[in-house]
Amino acid sequence: MRKIILLLIPLLACLISCSEKKNSSYRKQDIAEDLNIIVIHVDDLGWTDVGAFGSDYYETPNIDKLANQGVKFTNSYAAAAICSPTRAAMLTGKHPARTGITDWIRARFQGGIIPEDGSNPQGYDENGDRPLKTPKNYLYMPLSEVTIAELLKERGYQTGHIGKWHLGPEEYFPENQGFDVNIGGCDLGQPPSYFDPYEPFNGNEEYIIPNLPSRKEGEYLTDREGDEAVKFIAENKESKFFLQWASYTVHTPLMAKDELVDKYDSLEKGKQDNAVYAAMVESLDDNVGKIMHALDSLGLTDNTLLIFTSDNGGLMGNPNSQVTNNSPLRSQKGYPYEGGIRVPTIMRWPGNIPAGKTSKSPIITMDILPTVLRYVDGSVDESKWDGKDLSTVISHPEKEFKRDLFWHFPHYRGRDVVPYSIIRSGDFKLIKYHDGSEGELYDLKNDLGENENLISENPELARELELKLEEWLIDTKAKMPVKK
């Protein structure tokens, strides 16, 4: 018996050692106290606007490399089909229906003047001859909202914002929402110009980026943002940092460097054919590469979670002046179809996130905050947010995790878009129109382009999804349009 025990001791030691080695690769995911976090939040980038997601016209070697080094999410969604709601959702982990920011926020030069009492607008817009009164949209994200930057500052992070903010005037800028550094973040939803000194052609002093001083006349804005990002990374290399680069590109005005426009003018065009837009995408890619190179040269790559995503679907423009093409998805930015809300998303953290994998699990903007906290703290209480911790999804990209996703837009947008709410449950997507128009039901697995409305053929399924949607609207206390 003694011999057996003596023989078993080395075996047990080996098993314990092997078990420790097996689990050690996951310990970094359990808690990573010195993890750096970079979120690249692109403006208006469509689902197929990069090579890794299907473009054969736009050249994006650095973003494609990022996808090869991490997990690519093909069922990734923006929280809204327009910018401000998605941006607030990313920062707070809360759905636009819950934050109350359900439309894009008007800047000062667009009439976004906050009342003397400092409150966000209440009540309804009458909308002329339209049948619904719609809730007034907020003019700022309240300072009472706790942002991912504030949460990470509490954990000892240096925090930086570069680029577009679009969540209210000066008193609501990034530096008042947890960011130590703010370069370019103001109330504007688009730049007055993409070339230094970034001044409007009409001379409107309210249509400027107040915290982006001129550096070199003629310098391209996306290049400037990339340089500022690298500078922030280098200055904080000895500490842990959170950087949000919310690029102004590829939002209008369409402006690009001449040499890149000439390059794309000379290339064979397909479904995507706008040379200026293509040049803007390439400049974006160049500066993603600039950040990746900086992380490599500073020895920070393996200790940095890098998230790449977009705030809504691509802007297609009109048939006579196409901006981009979102096919096989239907429609574009601002609309309730996949072309308005499905976006490219990539996550990379070498040694912790599988490389070169694709996940089909549905994810949404609000998931970023709880996922980051899960990696930083080792655990997260999801009940505090509308987003979900994606760490299991990321670790097992081959598995498809099911969940319900929701959207809410209680406003009119031009003459085409009426107030709507959406639920995606499994492969099915229901669009409910609040003006009484017939809803739409699509099987996304077999009809990604949303060509065949199945609602009349599946009334029971449609009603089941509608009841889920109505329950969610009540739970979030969503602002609703009302009949006149």
Language-model features, listed with the residues they occupy:
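Active-site-proximal N-terminal segment of extracellular/periplasmic enzymes that hydrolyze or transfer
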Residues: S25-V71, E452-E460
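Formylglycine-dependent
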Residues: R106-Q158, W165-F241, S247-A256, E268-K269, ...
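Histidine-centered active-site microenvironments of extracellular/periplasmic hydrolases
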Residues: P174-G178, P253-K257, H293-N352, I364
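A long, amphipathic alpha-helix that forms part
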Residues: G226-N236, D262-T304, R463, E471
